[in-house]
Design a protein with these regions (language model features):
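Amphipathic alpha-helical segments
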Residues: 15-30
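SF2 helicase catalytic motif II
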Residues: 69-74
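Conserved ATPase-coupling elements of RecA-like P-loop NTPase cores
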Residues: 78-82
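Intrinsically disordered, low-complexity regulatory regions enriched in serine/threonine/proline
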Residues: 86-119
Length: 119
């Protein structure tokens, strides 16, 4: 059985870095071994792969590969004038992913990880 591939995307790169730090803290706290790959800020564990990809990317490869898309969209942190641009980028991503791909938020992803590694 192949491991699921989760792709995380956010509006701001700062949020992606914060998500990475949070994930590393969770992995370390749960004693989960992982490997980091530099391309797309990628994490690999024994149970899944996570790729962090920018929302405004010309490279749709991370989205085509994913079995679950993690959208981290905090509209309160962007100017109202940029809403259409964000919506357009999200729609493009949703057209790139496989029709079976689940779309979740980062809180749901954290619950999935916790459940995966419960003893």
């Amino acid at each position: 059985m192949t491991k699921p591939i989760y792709t995380y995307t956010s509006i701001h790169i700062k949020e992606a870095f914060q998500f990475e730090q949070l994930l590393e803290n969770i992995f370390n706290g749960m004693n989960v071994s992982y490997k980091r790959k530099s391309e797309y800020m990628e994490f690999e564990t024994d149970k899944f792969t996570l790729i962090c990809a920018p929302l405004f990317s010309n490279n749709c490869f991370p989205y085509k590969r994913c079995s679950c898309l993690i959208l981290d969209l905090d509209y309160s942190r962007i100017p109202f004038a940029a809403y259409d641009k964000v919506d357009y980028a999200v729609e493009n991503i949703l057209h790139e992913i496989h029709h079976d791909t689940e779309v979740i938020d980062k809180n749901d992803f954290m619950k999935i990880i916790k459940k995966m590694y419960e003893v």
